[in-house]
Amino acid sequence: MAEESDDDKTEAPTPHRLEKAREEGQIPRSRELTSLLILLVGVCIIWFGGESLARQLAGMLSAGLHFDHRMVNDPNLILGQIILLIKAAMMALLPLIAGVVLVALISPVMLGGLIFSGKSLQPKFSKLNPLPGIKRMFSAQTGAELLKAVLKSTLVGCVTGFYLWHHWPQMMRLMAESPIVAMGNALDLVGLCALLVVLGVIPMVGFDVFFQIFSHLKKLRMSRQDIRDEFKESEGDPHVKGKIRQMQRAAAQRRMMEDVPKADVIVTNPTHYSVALQYDENKMSAPKVVAKGAGLIALRIREIGAEHRVPTLEAPPLARALYRHAEIGQQIPGQLYAAVAEVLAWVWQLKRWRLAGGQRPPQPENLPVPEALDFMNEKNTDG
């Protein structure tokens, strides 16, 4: 069978496809975003720490230009002076270097996240084939990268050139100033120029981030056949099947709990079961079950019912029969019509009592539940 072309891959990648690509180290990256953040951090460090940096660099420059006649006869003094100058330069530039390195390590995480994959480091002999390399040279991706580089270089060059032309007199005055003052003013000029460059490239960086995400998703597009194959593969995975069933049960239980406030009555076996019933004589031919559960779920049904003032009736045989023989969203069995009718009659009496007051209606007893629908062992357990 011939391989599918890119034209056939019109579907967005599935979460499984994205996760698999991530495990293989295929995530969107924007070098422009990293460059922008590095430049921005450098500008901030120079802007806020420029005075201290200027003093240290000026002191280092002054010490470097100072000539000690003893160095002529003692080469060790020259070596010691060089080491001192290197240490001074490192201490002066340490905040700038540390900030830039830290941002260079962290910035890729902002777009694609932190991931370590050894697969991208494995040798691929297919890369030795020159034909795919030549094809990549003339691809749309390469053309877009070239256009982006030309635009960025042009923009940075124009901003820098305009800035130098506008501040040329100030730069010329630096030669007449003391070393410390000149160094501080020079750093201010450099910082302002870098800030203007940052502001100029922000729109381009935003476009690059969007372009990288779009290209990444386009590269991972799938055909309809790919999606069907992935689904079949996932369906055969017991872990995935179990996860799907678990999610389906959780969703069904969540929907069921949302329907409890709509119930007219909750029939309970206090130690085991709860069944919520609803009946609308204008829309339903028979009462239906909107929620049911055992154990903790039964307790939660009763709690939600109490929060919404849904009447609760303790009727263990009826609760057991409804739990065993009625399904959620379905009408109750015909054999239980008589018992449920007595329960609903009590509910209507209870509603009238709440509105008009008077004597509270007694709960129905000895409801007619067929023995075939009850379970004698549970009946004995309840006492």
Swiss-Prot record:
The keyword Repeat does not apply. The keyword Protein transport applies. It is a multi-pass membrane protein. Residues 1-26, 359-383 are annotated as: Disordered. One of its GO terms (biological process) is bacterial-type flagellum assembly. Keywords: Bacterial flagellum biogenesis, Bacterial flagellum protein export, Cell inner membrane, Cell membrane, Membrane, Protein transport, Transmembrane, Transmembrane helix, Transport. The chain crosses the membrane at residues 33-53, 75-95, 96-116, 146-166, 191-211. It is found in: Cell inner membrane. Residues 10-26 have a biased composition (Basic and acidic residues). Pfam families: Bac_export_2. Signal peptide: none annotated. One of its GO terms (cellular component) is plasma membrane. Its main location: membrane. Required for formation of the rod structure in the basal body of the flagellar apparatus. Together with FliI and FliH, may constitute the export apparatus of flagellin. Belongs to the type III secretion exporter family. This is Flagellar biosynthetic protein FlhB.
